[in-house]
């Protein structure tokens, strides 16, 4: 019979080996992004993204099976797992991705024990250890500005050394330098560029490649992103972004995750935090594709906020939904969504179908228009931190998802998302110009979603939101479907007065039929805002528009929605 220490060592070794396999496979998939960009193999890039998203759960599940086999009847021995945690920590302590390894261990323990809340004896509560320091080789390269901004940009573009030619590198460096120098003159702080510190790894996503760094200008730093695309005639510097707002949109929670080679994620996150100080650490890990560890960091941020404030969960702003109970913490820009036990008419979906829709969004190109939702299970919160309104709604409508104790309320399943302002409230409260811009972007959002094969299903304004950057996004997924699964039809012409005045449809309507001409009343737009929408986006109300989108998707066209405005494209602006 094996000694307990031997069993613990075997269990820790099994988890460490699984984590090592995960990181190696993840890195292998990520490395392919460069070749996909160079060869313009966008379909393969999409397949890589899906493969990487599924990878961690697959290996964690396999690891759980291995560990159960190693531990046998002691699989739920708490003392044994405490020893395993110590042994595992020793194995990953010196790794540059130590925090990712700790989250991997936590995932395994939670699958085995189905832990409610957090068990500090067998889980890592935080990536404790020394403060983030630059490794022996920093994650960025430093380029001094010795001659001109144009020469500096020319140098960094050449340093990429893609196995594909630039369409016109000299032109791109010249135009980008004009844009950047003009912006810096407007700052009027008298600080010229001294150097550019650029992350060595290229950030790939969809059809884009991004060089990310910061300009050193005396006591100031300026974020900088060079956005590259690969067209039919070669690689092009498509945009240069140099404000916190524009760079933040590149790393938005409405975007799919980057494929970027990173050996020291904690150090890279620390660097990115200097560019984007308003972004939480959790969001940066998630943007880099370490979404499971990002979820761990998000939980820690939530727990820290609860511990440090006297805030209670309160109902989120907006109309109450039929599918979810939604609440928030006033000082934290996160909403929590719990699926209700029953859905009142006219909803005809099921809990499983709702969860499948969220899973679909997780694996889909979010096009900058779909909120990333982090899925949690078995969380516990202090009972005295729930307002009476939230507690009443959870007790009455989500009883199957919660357990109420004297000290804690445990939630079996919830989604956490970034909090945004519901579009219907935003328009109601905004001035006329701002409301017009929101309506225009609402139409653009519908078109971006359509181009990436997403039809919201329910187009009521309350199901859309506005980010702090003024972008319209969609966050209510229970009726979401693929554009290619819909049948877009023109309304038949009535053949007589009886049909024209009938209060019921006098023609057959299939389950997947959509009549775009009938969508306008559901949008809830009136007066001048209705006119603004119709003038700019009236084509959305025609079946012809949607059928054309379906044809493009079925022909294999892959549309990439870039994280910057059309007018920010460099060649577009100077042709």
Swiss-Prot record:
Enzyme Commission (EC) number: 2.7.11.5, 3.1.3.-
GO CC: one term?
Answer: cytoplasm
State what protein this is by name: Isocitrate dehydrogenase kinase/phosphatase
- The family this protein is said to belong to: Belongs to the AceK family.
Q: Which GO biological-process labels does this protein carry?
A: glucose metabolic process; glyoxylate cycle; tricarboxylic acid cycle
- What is the annotated localization of this protein? Cytoplasm
Record-linked InterPro entries: AceK_kinase, AceK_regulatory, Isocitrate_DH_AceK
Q: Does the keyword Ribonucleoprotein apply?
A: no
Question: Could you state a single Gene Ontology molecular function term?
Answer: AMP binding
PANTHER family (alphabetical): ISOCITRATE DEHYDROGENASE KINASE_PHOSPHATASE, PTHR39559
Q: What does this protein do?
A: Bifunctional enzyme which can phosphorylate or dephosphorylate isocitrate dehydrogenase (IDH) on a specific serine residue. This is a regulatory mechanism which enables bacteria to bypass the Krebs cycle via the glyoxylate shunt in response to the source of carbon. When bacteria are grown on glucose, IDH is fully active and unphosphorylated, but when grown on acetate or ethanol, the activity of IDH declines drastically concomitant with its phosphorylation.
Domain of life of the organism in this record?
Bacteria
Keyword field? ATP-binding, Cytoplasm, Glyoxylate bypass, Hydrolase, Kinase, Nucleotide-binding, Protein phosphatase, Serine/threonine-protein kinase, Transferase, Tricarboxylic acid cycle
Q: Chief localization class?
A: cytoplasm
Q: Which organism is it from?
A: Anaeromyxobacter sp. (strain Fw109-5)
Keyword Disulfide bond set for record: no
Q: Which reaction does it catalyse?
A: L-seryl-[isocitrate dehydrogenase] + ATP = O-phospho-L-seryl-[isocitrate dehydrogenase] + ADP + H(+)
Entry binding sites for ATP: 316-322, 337
């Amino acid at each position: 019979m094996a000694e307990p220490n031997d069993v613990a060592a075997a269990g820790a070794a099994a988890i460490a080996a699984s984590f090592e396999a995960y990181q190696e496979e993840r890195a292998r998939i990520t490395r392919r992004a460069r070749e996909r960009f160079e060869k313009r193999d966008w379909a393969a890039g999409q397949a890589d993204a899906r493969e990487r998203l599924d990878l961690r759960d697959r290996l964690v599940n396999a690891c759980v099976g291995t560990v159960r086999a190693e531990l046998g009847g002691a699989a739920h021995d708490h003392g044994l797992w405490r020893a395993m945690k110590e042994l595992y920590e020793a194995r990953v302590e010196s790794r540059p991705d130590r925090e990712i390894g700790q989250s991997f261990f936590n995932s395994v323990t939670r699958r085995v024990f189905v832990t409610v809340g957090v068990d500090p004896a067998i889980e890592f509560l935080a990536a404790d250890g020394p403060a983030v320091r630059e490794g022996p080789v920093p994650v960025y390269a430093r380029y001094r500005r010795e001659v001109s901004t144009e020469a500096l940009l020319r140098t960094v573009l050449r340093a990429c050394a893609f196995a594909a030619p630039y369409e016109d590198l000299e032109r791109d460096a010249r135009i980008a330098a004009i844009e950047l120098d003009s912006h810096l003159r407007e700052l009027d702080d008298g600080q010229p560029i001294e150097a550019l510190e650029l992350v060595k790894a290229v950030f790939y996503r969809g059809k884009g490649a991004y060089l990310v760094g910061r300009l050193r200008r005396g006591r100031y730093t300026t974020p900088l992103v060079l956005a590259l695309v690969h067209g039919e005639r070669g690689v092009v510097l498509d945009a240069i972004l140099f404000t916190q707002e524009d760079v933040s949109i590149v790393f938005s929670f409405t975007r799919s995750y980057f494929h970027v080679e990173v050996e020291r994620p904690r150090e890279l996150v620390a660097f990115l935090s200097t560019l984007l100080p308003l972004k939480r650490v959790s969001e940066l890990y998630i943007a880099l594709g370490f979404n499971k560890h990002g979820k761990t960091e998000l939980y820690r941020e939530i727990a820290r906020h609860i511990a440090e404030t006297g805030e209670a969960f309160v109902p989120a702003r907006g109309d109450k939904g039929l599918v979810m109970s939604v609440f928030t913490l006033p000082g934290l820009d996160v909403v929590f969504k719990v699926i209700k036990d029953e859905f009142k008419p006219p909803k005809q979906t099921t809990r499983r179908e709702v969860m499948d829709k969220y899973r679909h969004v997780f694996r889909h190109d979010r096009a900058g228009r779909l909120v990333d939702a982090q899925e949690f299970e078995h969380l516990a919160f202090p009972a005295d931190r729930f307002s009476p309104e939230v507690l009443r709604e959870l007790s009455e409508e989500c009883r199957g998802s919660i357990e109420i104790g004297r000290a804690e309320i445990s939630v079996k399943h919830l989604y956490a998302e970034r909090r945004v302002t519901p579009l219907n409230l935003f328009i109601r409260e905004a001035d006329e110009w701002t409301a017009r811009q929101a309506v225009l972007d609402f139409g653009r959002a519908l078109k971006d979603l359509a181009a990436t094969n997403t039809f919201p299903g329910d187009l009521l304004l309350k199901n859309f939101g506005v980010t702090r950057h003024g972008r319209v996004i969609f966050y209510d997924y229970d009726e979401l479907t693929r554009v290619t699964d819909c049948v877009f039809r023109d309304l038949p012409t009535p053949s007589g007065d009886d049909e024209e005045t009938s209060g019921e449809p006098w023609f057959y309507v299939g389950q997947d039929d959509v009549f775009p001409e009938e969508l306008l009343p559901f949008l809830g737009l009136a007066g001048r805002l209705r006119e603004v929408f119709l003038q700019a986006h009236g084509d959305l109300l025609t079946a012809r528009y949607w059928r054309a989108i379906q044809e493009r998707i079925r022909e294999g066209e892959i549309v990439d929605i870039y994280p910057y405005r059309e007018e920010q494209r460099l060649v577009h602006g100077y042709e």
